Amino acid sequence: MFLGGLFFEWIQTVLILAGYVSGNATFPKPLNKSEEKKYLDLYAKGDESAKNVLIEHNLRLVAHIAKKYADEKNLEDLISIGTIGLIKGINTFNPQKNSRLSTYISRCIENEVLMVMRSSKKLQNEISIDESIGTDQIGRAHV
């Protein structure tokens, strides 16, 4: 149940993000401290629309962090992965710890991105059983 809900939230957020990335629209500005507290309180009371506001207003942070680690080929993938970190961060944020939401979720986003980058780096060294041994990528034999 939890993973299905998280996946649905992720898809919804990625669609919102895709609209910003592909169009001329800009990301919503980050919430100020009082607005952030208001929406966190509403979300704590079960208001899912408040959670969506928190997600939308922190997408700029996701894009900023993803750009630090991305090249031209994987920016969109890292933004999607960072969005998962954003959602996880909002779900686990504890306002009683006296830190700003943006501080906490920036670590969650960065951790999610780095975790995926580490796992994909491990896979780069693996060789498929279908790959020819002794030839390069275009099929020339090595001597």
Locate predicted features.
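Long, serine/threonine/proline-rich intrinsically disordered regions in eukaryotic cortical polarity
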Residues: 133-137
